[in-house]
């Protein structure tokens, strides 16, 4: 897959869509759309009437009936074409993904030991739990987690990004995807899925899934359109006997014909939005994929448009994410070198960027070399989201580093005293927007390591846009409240959650949802999975863990947490497109009434000619012009349905006024102009 944007009307896509639009004329396919199914039945009935007239079995104007039948079929075909074109774009994207999926040979290890026994096995035979080693130049055979090693990986086949990425054990960049290529070094990977369940397989099935589930708003709108169709159907059915009765009573005029009744019905029902509704939904998912985000369903895209609370991780979303150790700040009585030595020891097995930067800073400041933890008989204590600290046990030294509250609990649990001087150091670092990392040895606090982070350029303006859209932004961070408050003020977020734990994230989401709000968040770690599963829109990072990707309802192939803002924009654009075209369609119908109703009943009530405010040539030309316009307007709106309406951040009332002016008033005016032009053309060409 590449990031190359498909043009809206590529010749291949149009050719395939034209063929698919004919195939979709099968009754089973038409039945899924109640509005267009009525048009489909009307097309068939007028065709039968036209054939009967040609055969002399039925009295009527065969030329007029044939033209009505032809344009009713065009209406069906144009609606099919819109949906087929939207689906064709998704199928083309799926085809490029299928080109990535291929069977290769993998080197399977019998144990987690890189130097242990190994054997060759086809990639499609690998199962969850199998361990493989991938050397430079080889293809990663399965989705999995890196358990040893680090390498430069080319993920362009999946993400479209040509720049290689680093995948390594530990941290948030340990997840690898089958079908990508190792460019340098080596990786030992534990497979996390069985054959047929890989991320690539799921991407393909999501993109090309023929049985697209309708979203709740789409279902609600379909019910409304169906109800309107049934009402107009009942009205039109009663008009024929009413017309016959009127002619008999008045002894003048002619009854309305079945052909005109069918044309009247098709023009009364909301065929414009009925024909484009499915295409809008498919195109929404396609636009999401063009942004390198895979949505599990249209429901997720639609929910993104309704979101009013964004939970954003500080690191990588609001800040650049590469926090680096900048300073060792010892407490009184402790030398800076002793603090640096303890901090380095606790970080030797720490795979995070922060841990590595501490090792580098200690080496630069005091020429402290890395030591082998095995030779020291040391036990590394990994970071936990629950304890919020990590460290090492070496000989009689128990060294820990972590958040200030976590170290305080650790010291107090070991009957030590947490000095006030540390609080002063922590506040000094926090007020500058840095992150304080407290280091302790046994029951004694040694000092603070200052970590620097930088707020991304332009992020404050983006949050201002969110605010204008009525969306509340909340920064989530493990930092203390002072640091969080400083960065939140600099970034311009509405609120923040400091010292966040998985339980705190989950509780915050549930709190907002209990207030009737829809919540969106991003995540990449296993500890994010519960909150991702609870959120209404959950965007998991492709570089994250398998648990996070399974808990989310979207996956960002670029692993860019800031993408959440773009996801919300695409979701709102899809809802705006559906709402705008619905407004345009209903306004269209109101305008069409002025053209077709006087024309339809002119033969029964000649006095109704006074309502011919557009001065159309004749009742037959008026009816045919309206039917032709009803079909052509679908074609003209296909680009808008697929690309989406232009969306600018503003409050709901201003947005409503803008759309009523553009699509409401535009929908009223367009039919008057279009029908009149078609009537003039018909008068010149065929009608007398």
UniProtKB/Swiss-Prot annotation:
EC top class, as a word: translocase
UniProt entry keywords in alphabetical sequence: ATP-binding, Cell inner membrane, Cell membrane, Ion transport, Magnesium, Membrane, Metal-binding, Nucleotide-binding, Phosphoprotein, Potassium, Potassium transport, Translocase, Transmembrane, Transmembrane helix, Transport
Molecular-function GO terms, alphabetical: ATP binding; ATP hydrolysis activity; magnesium ion binding; P-type potassium transmembrane transporter activity
Positions contributing to ATP binding: 350, 354, 383-390, 401
TM annotation in the entry: 35-55, 62-82, 219-239, 260-280, 594-614, 622-642, 667-687
Binding site for Mg(2+): 524, 528
Reaction(s) this enzyme catalyzes, per UniProt: K(+)(out) + ATP + H2O = K(+)(in) + ADP + phosphate + H(+)
Entry membrane topology: Multi-pass membrane protein
CDD domains, A to Z: P-type_ATPase_K
Parts forming coiled coils: none
Entry annotation: catalytic residues: 313 (4-aspartylphosphate intermediate)
NCBIfam families on file: ATPase_P-type, kdpB
Family: Belongs to the cation transport ATPase (P-type) (TC 3.A.3) family. Type IA subfamily.
Function, as annotated: Part of the high-affinity ATP-driven potassium transport (or Kdp) system, which catalyzes the hydrolysis of ATP coupled with the electrogenic transport of potassium into the cytoplasm. This subunit is responsible for energy coupling to the transport system and for the release of the potassium ions to the cytoplasm.
Assembly and oligomerization: The system is composed of three essential subunits: KdpA, KdpB and KdpC.
HAMAP family: KdpB
Name recorded for this polypeptide: Potassium-transporting ATPase ATP-binding subunit
């Amino acid at each position: 897959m590449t990031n190359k944007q498909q043009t809206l009307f590529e010749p291949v896509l149009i050719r395939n869509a034209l063929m698919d639009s004919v195939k979709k004329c099968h009754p089973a396919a038409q039945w899924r759309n109640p509005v267009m199914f009525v048009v489909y039945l009307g097309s068939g009935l007028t065709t039968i009437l036209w054939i009967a007239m040609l055969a002399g079995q039925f009295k009527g104007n065969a030329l007029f009936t044939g033209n009505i039948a032809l344009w009713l079929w065009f209406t069906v075909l144009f609606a099919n074409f819109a949906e087929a074109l939207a689906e064709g774009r998704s199928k083309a994207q799926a085809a490029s993904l299928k080109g990535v999926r291929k069977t290769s040979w993998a080197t399977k290890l019998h144990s987690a030991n890189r130097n242990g026994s190994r054997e060759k096995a086809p990639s499609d035979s690998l199962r969850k739990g199998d361990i493989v080693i991938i050397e430079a130049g080889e293809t990663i055979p399965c989705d999995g987690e890196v358990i040893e090693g680090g390498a430069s990986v080319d993920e362009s086949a999946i993400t479209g990004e040509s720049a290689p990425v680093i995948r390594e054990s530990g941290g948030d960049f340990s997840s690898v995807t089958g079908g990508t290529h190792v460019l340098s070094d080596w990786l030992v990977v534990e497979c996390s899925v069985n054959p047929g369940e890989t991320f690539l397989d799921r991407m393909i099935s999501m993109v090309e899934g023929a049985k697209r589930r309708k979203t709740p708003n789409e279902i609600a709108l379909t019910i409304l359109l169906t109800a309107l169709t049934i009402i107009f159907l009942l009205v039109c059915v009663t008009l024929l006997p009413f017309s016959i009765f009127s002619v008999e009573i008045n002894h003048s005029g002619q009854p309305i014909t079945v052909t005109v009744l069918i044309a009247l019905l098709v023009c009364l029902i909301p065929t414009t939005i009925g024909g484009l509704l499915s295409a809008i939904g498919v195109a929404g998912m396609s636009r999401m994929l063009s942004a390198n985000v895979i949505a599990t369903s249209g429901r997720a895209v639609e929910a993104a448009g309704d979101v009013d609370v964004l939970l954003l991780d500080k690191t990588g979303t609001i800040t650049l994410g590469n926090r680096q150790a900048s300073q060792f700040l010892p407490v009184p009585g402790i030398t800076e070198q002793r603090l640096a030595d303890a901090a380095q020891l606790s970080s030797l097995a720490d795979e995070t960027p922060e841990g590595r930067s501490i090792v580098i800073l200690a080496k630069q400041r005091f020429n402290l070399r890395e030591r082998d933890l095995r030779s020291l008989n040391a036990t590394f204590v990994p970071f936990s989201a629950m304890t919020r600290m990590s460290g090492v046990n070496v000989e009689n030294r128990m060294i820990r580093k972590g958040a200030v509250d976590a170290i305080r609990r650790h010291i107090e649990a070991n009957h030590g005293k947490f000095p006030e001087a540390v609080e002063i150091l922590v506040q000094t670092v926090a007020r500058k927007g840095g992150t304080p990392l407290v280091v302790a040895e046994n029951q004694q606090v040694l000092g603070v390591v200052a970590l620097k982070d930088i707020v991304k350029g332009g992020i404050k303006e983006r949050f201002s846009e969110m605010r204008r859209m009525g969306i509340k932004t909340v920064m989530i961070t493990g930092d203390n409240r002072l640091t969080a408050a400083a960065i939140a003020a600099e970034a311009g977020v509405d609120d923040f959650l400091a010292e966040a734990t998985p339980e705190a994230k989950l509780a915050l989401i549930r709190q907002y949802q209990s207030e009737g709000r829809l919540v969106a968040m991003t995540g990449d770690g296993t500890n994010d999975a519960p909150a991702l599963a609870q959120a209404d829109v959950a965007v998991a990072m492709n570089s994250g863990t398998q648990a996070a990707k399974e808990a989310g309802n979207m996956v960002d192939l670029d692993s860019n947490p800031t993408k959440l803002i773009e996801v919300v924009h695409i979701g709102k654009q899809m809802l705006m497109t559906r709402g705008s075209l619905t407004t345009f369609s209903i306004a269209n119908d109101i305008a069409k009434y002025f053209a077709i109703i006087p024309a339809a009943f002119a033969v029964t009530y000649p006095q109704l000619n006074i309502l011919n405010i557009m001065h159309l040539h004749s009742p037959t030309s008026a009816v045919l012009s309206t039917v032709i316009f009803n079909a052509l307007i679908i074609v003209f709106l296909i680009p808008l349905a697929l690309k989406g309406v232009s969306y600018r951040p503003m409050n709901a009332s201003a947005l409503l006024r803008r759309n009523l002016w553009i699509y409401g008033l535009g929908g009223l005016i367009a039919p008057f102009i279009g029908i009149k032009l078609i009537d003039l053309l018909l008068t010149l060409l065929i009608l007398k």
